Swiss-Prot record:
Protein name in UniProt: ABC transporter ATP-binding protein/permease wht-3
Location(s), subcellular: Membrane
BP term (GO), one: transmembrane transport
Source taxon at top rank: Eukaryota
Annotated ATP binding sites: G74, A75, S76, G77, A78, G79, K80, T81
Length: 610
């Protein structure tokens, strides 16, 4: 059964005395955590037509104590990332794991996410927000505390991580939108994780891509965090080797060494691989622990001897004893989630700021609808009440429905593809429920995808010469809003269902064409084959077109017309003069259906993304 972090958080806190950590200063010593792992084995799962399994980790053991900054090092493919994922219980899809991970002597699984933070290598933010705004919203999601306490925590973190100079700058997107620097983005990643004041912090290559000065600055920050009693486990680069308290070298899925940096230099000298003068120790060590492509046999033999030497060493024996004698102590409680309404409010604020600060999309949609309203109104200017005018008026009504459908559906599809990685990360960090995000994003787009359609109807309405009583105008606007929301909800569903926008569009093009065909303009739907005819009731184009046509002609009073002429106008499309209310109900049903389907698709997609 999928792991629900938010539900588990409530269960976790129920077992411990309530402790308010929201007001605790970050510089104060936190609840100490000792992490141990013993005999960790990880293999790929057997596939249906293959019995081969790849061994990623083989009986790996280790320990990380409070106040220690532990570095996982090794060549590419050594098992560093796999071990990190095992300790965090993340990204284990398709893998089989054996062995135990303990925190303070207690066996632990996915609940470790409740007492730890994870600063990932890839920085993903909302680029339109400032650093201060982003941290305040993150604090609202991570802390059950009042606004004053959250403000103090954010100010403290900004000062600690030296983000004062960029607190009011927009985050931006590297290479696209000017914003904060790479070093500031890396520190912002740590700032988000520190908001909940965790005792255990994981970091994935925190200095990768930074210059030597910025890398040293980040490591010094990590060192300060470790000095306050936190346990830090991360994958570093090799430049700052001697800054770490403990080094764990991995090779071929096994532990080749665990100890202090100075002990590693002595260890490799003792096993026959002394580090030459003027050589960088970590680079030399990693060269000896790497499998060289053109000399694999000799490389594996050398690595095997180093691992064997380590397993027989006193350093290894001491670590095994240390792992097994750790006393069981109380685990720290995790800060309680602020709740559904608080997190939805925070996400709604974030989404609205993002929409407001992306004026290009708003401007283009409004301009598009104004231009199309003027174009359709000019094309069908003041149609007379004769047979030709009736046909032209019906065509104008259909083109209004088509414009509300196609531009809206394809316009909404682009938002999910770029935002999903951030949402998946935050969800798996336990910051919110999927429904909270979905509601907030839907509400943030609602005004934009409502006003523009109504504006187009208002512009073109009197230009075409439609029935202009206030009741008819209001009914037409209602139909336009519901048609646009139908297209919005369908586009949102497809964006949530498919991994890329191109796939969603590839499906939407024939689907929208079918909906348009079933509208009634291109043929009397009652004359369609029975196996196709039923599909008209799934088409919002059909409901919308009928609603506008019925609204236009059911109340027209022209003394030159035959008494039955109005009914003939409707009958050619298989429309009924009493169906306006049914059309509104049908459109509302489609809107509700696609919004619910979109939520289910997004929920499944995010849950499976771990």
């Amino acid at each position: 059964m999928p792991f629900d972090l938010l539900a588990e958080r409530k269960r976790w806190n129920a077992g411990y005395e309530s402790i308010d950590t929201s007001s605790q200063k970050l510089t104060e010593v936190v609840t100490p955590i000792t992490v141990t792992w013993e005999n960790i084995e990880v293999k790929t799962r057997k596939k249906l037509f293959s019995k081969k399994q790849k061994q990623l980790l083989n009986r790996v053991s280790g320990i990380a104590k409070p106040g220690e900054m532990v570095a996982l090092m090794g060549a590419s493919g050594a098992g560093k990332t796999t071990l990190m994922n095992v300790l965090m219980c993340r990204n284990m899809k398709g893998l089989e794991k054996n062995g135990t991970v303990k925190v303070n002597g207690t066996k632990i699984g996915k609940e470790i996410s409740l007492i730890s933070g994870f600063a990932q290598q890839q920085e993903i933010f909302i680029p339109t927000l400032t650093v201060d705004e982003y941290l305040m919203i993150q604090a609202r999601l991570r802390m059950k505390a009042n606004k004053h306490t959250r403000r103090e925590r954010v100010d403290e973190i900004i000062e600690m991580l030296r983000l004062q100079n960029c607190r009011d700058l927009k985050i931006g997107t590297p290479g696209l939108v000017k914003g904060i620097s790479g070093g500031e983005a890396r520190r912002l990643t740590f700032a988000c994780e520190l908001l909940s004041n965790p005792s255990l912090l994981f970091a994935d290559e925190p200095t990768s891509g930074l210059d030597s000065f910025m890398a040293a600055s980040v490591v010094q920050i990590l060192k300060n965090l470790a000095n306050s009693g936190r346990t830090l486990i991360h994958q570093p680069t090799a430049e700052l080797f001697f800054q770490f308290d403990k080094i764990i070298f991995l090779s071929m899925g096994k532990t080749a060494f665990m100890g202090t940096p100075h002990e590693s230099v002595k260890f490799f000298a003792d096993c026959g691989h002394p580090i030459p003068k003027l050589f960088n120790p970590p680079e030399w060590i990693q060269s000896k622990l790497s499998v060289i492509p053109n000399n694999e046999t000799k490389s594996r033999e050398t690595i095997g001897k180093i691992i064997e030497f380590y397993e027989k060493s006193i350093i290894h024996q001491k670590s095994i004893v240390e792992i097994r004698v750790i006393a069981t102590t109380e685990l720290p409680p995790y800060i309680e989630n602020p709740g559904f309404f608080a997190e939805t409010g925070a996400l709604l604020k974030r989404a609205c700021l993002d929409v407001i600060r992306s004026p290009a999309q708003m401007r283009m949609k409004l301009i598009q609808k104004v231009v199309m309203g003027l174009f359709i109104g000019s094309l069908y200017w003041q149609q007379p009440l004769d047979p030709r005018g009736v046909r032209n008026t019906n065509s104008a009504l259909y083109f209004l429905i088509a414009e509300l459908t196609f531009s809206t559906m394809f316009g909404i599809m682009t938002f999910m593809e770029h935002e999903l990685p951030l949402i998946a990360r935050e969800y798996h960090d336990g910051l919110f429920y999927v429904i909270s995000y979905y509601i907030s994003r839907f509400l943030s787009y609602l005004p934009l995808f409502t006003i523009d359609g109504a504006l187009m109807i208002v512009i073109s309405y009197w230009m075409i010469g439609l029935n202009s009583t206030w009741q008819q105008v209001a009914k037409s606007i209602l139909i336009s809003v519901l048609v646009e929301q139908s297209a919005t909800s369908c586009g949102l569903f497809l964006a949530c269902l498919f991994e890329t926008t191109s796939l969603a569009i590839a499906f939407a093009v024939p689907a929208s064409g079918l909906f348009a065909l079933l509208s009634g303009l291109y043929g009397n739907t009652n004359n369609f084959p029975v196996y196709i005819r039923w599909m008209q009731w799934t088409s919002w184009c059909r409901y919308g077109f009928e609603g506008l046509v019925v609204n236009q002609w059911s109340q027209v009073d022209n003394p030159k017309w035959d008494p039955f002429y109005r009914e003939l106008i409707l009958k050619q499309f298989s429309f009924n003069k009493d169906n306006y209310q049914l059309d509104v109900i049908g459109l509302c049903s489609i809107v509700i259906f696609f919004y619910l389907a979109g939520y289910i698709a997004l929920f499944i997609r995010i849950r499976l993304s771990r």
